Design a protein with these regions (language model features):
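Outer membrane beta-barrel
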Residues: 89-156, 288, 294-295, 301-305
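Transmembrane beta-strand segments of Gram-negative outer membrane beta-barrel proteins
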Residues: 30-59, 77-86, 109-118, 147-149, ...
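Cleavable N-terminal export/targeting peptides
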Residues: 1-37, 570-586
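Long, low-hydrophobicity, solvent-exposed regions enriched in small/turn-prone and acidic residues
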Residues: 33-96, 229-230, 367, 417-419, ...
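Exposed, low-structure sequence patches enriched in small/polar residues
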Residues: 64-72, 100, 181-183, 192, ...
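The substrate-binding groove and active-site-proximal loops of carbohydrate-active enzymes
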Residues: 122-126, 214, 271
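Outer-membrane beta-barrel translocator/receptor signature
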Residues: 65-71, 79-84, 98-103, 112-113, ...
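Hydrophobic, small-residue-rich alpha-helical packing segments that form membrane-like cores
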Residues: 153, 158, 162-219, 231
Length: 586
């Protein structure tokens, strides 16, 4: 990390944690502490779930291991207002298919407005800084009223193996350490936040990969400002502005301070080198409500050089403009939403391809009464790409205009039938997608595709007898260039509850017929049987089996059988230790 003292933030976090303790205790009425200890006691709740899956195949090579085990557990302690949830997930190694074993352990004790995270946890700051990733370390969240603060420090997820065919923990070859902070003030009408994120790879352990390229240790730092403001009763605004600096190689030659502006040095916290790339990201949006009508609009721009290691995936070099309107009619029984937008990439004109995307959609939903529901959607997605050939910059640019047009539409109709004692329903679904390429205003016939799916299902049952059954039919039509394919599949299912709903049995089966280019190809039959049994009040036992058979193909090598099995066991427990009364459960 380019912070002068990498332990600065963890030390500050520790001080904050120690400071929070006396503040929390001071909120207690010390005169009544003894009586609270005697009356409340220690409450413990938790659960454990065990799962074992089996697999066997005939006629084809196995597509997964024959045996796999998973354990999930949770435990929560409550004492004098403190709450400490603990979670654990374990899976054994899938050796034949190179899937690693893994174990996740974490605990997040909470007291009033303070939460401490330890172990494998995740915290979200903002889209541009840290979102959607987990860490192994420590974190702290403080929410005393309108003030909000969050801190974390730990090892971030990294998935790289020197031998890509090896199974095991893929994080062992090198580590990425990260830290971050989020401080803000807000309520329902307005909020303002300052976000900080920093990450650095260990440079002492960094192996070559099979690809033959030495991956370089990187480092990254991001600062962002977020705001949300409500203006009057109808208008609200929100936005975020972020700046990122990213050294692609920690070992690159340093640069003089006078060659780097103050912003790229991140107020002196970051030390750029010759591999530096930097950029900005910002967005602004508004919402305006006019009774039954609502208006929305947003603008977002992310530079090519913007990077954050606090997200699993981040799309840069893009600009988005979107607008939408929604309206209700006929006493809120009809809802209409229209949305459209434009996306542009290659903002700095540094690539040979310039792409523009146009998106428009219309959504309708209509519920005239309790028995009918209708909905529909139409979307148009257009992707325009200009391919340019720059062989001689002294002559005009040669170019080819390529457009991809994708259209989709779906319709849903639901009709409630029967009575309260014997409910039933009929549902119809239709989905159609069409795509095609246009090159210099000419349609490419070989690149056109159409996908259509239609399904009709009927469900009925009797709550008093615990019986429910369903049947249906699904049709699929596919046109992909010169390939024509269609299939239809009737299905049936039955669920039955017994022994005062303690035992639930289910049966599902279907037969699919496939035909391609006018010739019958094959059929697929599937059968699923399962059951769940509630043992006493806290134990659950589940067993299921599924068989898949593909047959009817002239090529015998394409016919096969597969069997899947799964055994589940679950246990919930809870009770009180001490206190005025005991309420233990087994």
């Amino acid at each position: 990390m380019s912070i002068q003292n990498p332990y600065c933030l963890p030390i500050c976090m520790l001080i904050a944690m120690l400071s929070a303790g006396p503040l929390c205790l001071s909120g207690q009425n010390l005169d009544n502490l003894g009586s609270s200890l005697r009356s409340e006691g220690l409450n413990i709740t938790g659960n454990i779930n065990l799962s074992n899956q089996t697999y066997w195949a005939s006629g084809i090579a196995p597509r997964r291991d024959g045996m796999m085990t998973m354990v999930r557990a949770g435990l929560n302690f409550r004492f004098l207002g403190f709450s400490a949830p603990f979670s654990m997930v374990f899976s054994d190694q899938n050796a034949n298919f190179n899937l690693p074993s893994y174990t996740f352990l974490g605990i997040s004790p909470r007291y009033k407005w303070a939460t401490l995270h330890a172990g494998d946890r995740n915290m979200n700051f903002s889209k541009y800084t840290m979102s959607g990733i987990s860490f192994r370390g420590a974190g702290l969240e403080l929410n005393p009223g309108k003030l909000q603060a969050a801190f974390f420090y730990g090892r971030l997820n990294r998935a790289l193996a020197n031998d890509l065919s090896a199974a095991g923990n893929l994080n062992d070859f090198y580590q990425r350490r990260g830290m971050g902070a989020r401080i803000g003030y807000g309520d329902q009408n307005s909020a303002y936040y300052l976000n900080f994120f920093s990450a650095r790879d260990r440079s002492d352990v960094f192996p070559d990969t099979e690809l033959g390229e030495r991956l370089r240790p990187t480092e990254n730092m991001v600062l962002s400002v977020q705001a949300r403001q409500r203006i009057g009763k109808r208008l609200s605004l929100h936005g975020e502005l972020a700046h990122s600096v990213y050294n692609q190689d920690q070992n690159a030659q340093p640069v003089a301070d006078e060659d780097i502006n103050f912003i790229n040095r991140m107020l002196g916290l970051f030390r750029p080198n010759q591999s530096l790339i930097s950029g900005q990201a910002y967005n602004i949006g508004l919402q305006y409500n006019l009774g039954q009508t609502g208006l929305q609009g947003s603008y977002e721009r992310i530079d090519r050089g913007y990077r954050t290691l606090g997200a699993l995936f981040f799309n840069n070099d893009t600009e988005n403009i979107t607008a939408g309107i929604n309206r209700t009619f006929f006493k809120n029984t009809l809802q209409v939403f229209v949305n459209g937008g434009l996306e542009r990439v290659n903002l700095d004109d540094s690539e040979r391809e310039a792409t523009d995307r146009v998106i428009a959609s219309v959504n309708l939903s209509y519920r005239p009464n309790d028995r009918w529901f209708l909905s529909g959607m139409y979307g148009n997605f257009r992707n325009d790409t200009k391919l340019r050939v720059r062989t001689d910059f002294t002559v005009p640019v040669d170019s080819i205009f390529l457009a991809q047009v994708n259209q989709s539409a779906n319709i849903t109709a639901l009709r409630q039938l029967g009575t309260t004692e014997r409910p039933a329903s009929l549902q119809f679904l239709l989905n159609h997608q069409r795509a095609g390429n246009v090159v210099n205003d000419s349609v490419v016939n070989s690149a056109q595709s159409r996908f259509t799916t239609a399904s009709l299902s009927f469900t009925a049952g009797s709550p008093t007898t615990g019986l429910q059954w369903n049947t249906g039919l699904t049709l699929n039509f596919i046109e992909l260039g010169a390939i024509r394919s269609r299939s239809f599949a009737p299905i049936v299912g039955i669920n039955k509850s017994l022994l005062n709903n303690a035992l639930t049995l289910n049966f599902n089966s279907g037969l699919s017929f496939f035909r391609q280019s006018g010739t019958e190809d094959n059929k697929v039959f599937n059968l699923h049987l399962g059951g769940n049994y509630q043992l006493r009040n806290s134990h659950r036992l589940g067993l299921s089996a599924m068989h898949i058979r593909r047959f009817g193909s002239p090529d015998a090598l394409r016919n096969f059988h597969e069997w899947y099995g799964q055994l589940n066991y679950g246990y919930n427990f809870g009770g009180k230790i001490g206190g005025g009364s005991s309420n233990n459960q087994n």
